[in-house]
């Protein structure tokens, strides 16, 4: 498992108090992990802080799953 995926999973588990077994790359923050729109904003802010990147609002709208977050962060930090 990649370092980025592990770090994203840790953030999601902590922020959403999610079951670690449910936090997979395909897991939707809203549909699978019970997040609401405010949770999504807080997750994006946590990703920005953890990885020292900026996620524009238009990009943040497309980050709906753990895998989406990992892909975006991987591209920004490459």
UniProtKB/Swiss-Prot annotation:
GO terms for cellular component: cytosol; membrane. Its main location: cytoplasm. Keywords: Cytoplasm, Fatty acid biosynthesis, Fatty acid metabolism, Lipid biosynthesis, Lipid metabolism, Phosphopantetheine, Phosphoprotein. SUPFAM superfamilies: ACP-like (SSF47336). The modification O-(pantetheine 4'-phosphoryl)serine is found at residue 37. Residues 2-77 form the Carrier domain. GO terms for molecular function: acyl binding; acyl carrier activity. It comes from the Bacteria. 4'-phosphopantetheine is transferred from CoA to a specific serine of apo-ACP by AcpS. This modification is essential for activity because fatty acids are bound in thioester linkage to the sulfhydryl of the prosthetic group. Pfam families: PP-binding (PF00550). It is found in: Cytoplasm. Belongs to the acyl carrier protein (ACP) family. NCBIfam families: acyl_carrier, PRK00982.1-2, PRK00982.1-3, PRK00982.1-4, PRK00982.1-5. This is Acyl carrier protein. It comes from Caulobacter vibrioides (strain NA1000 / CB15N). The gene is acpP.
């Amino acid at each position: 498992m990649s370092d980025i995926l592990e770090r994203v999973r840790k953030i999601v588990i902590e922020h959403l108090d999610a079951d670690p077994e449910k936090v997979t790359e395909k897991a939707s923050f809203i549909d699978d992990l019970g997040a609401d729109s405010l949770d999504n904003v807080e997750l994006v802010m946590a990703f920005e802080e953890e990885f020292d990147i900026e996620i524009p609002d238009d990009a943040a709208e497309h980050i709906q799953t753990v895998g989406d977050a990992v892909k975006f962060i991987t591209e920004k930090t490459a």
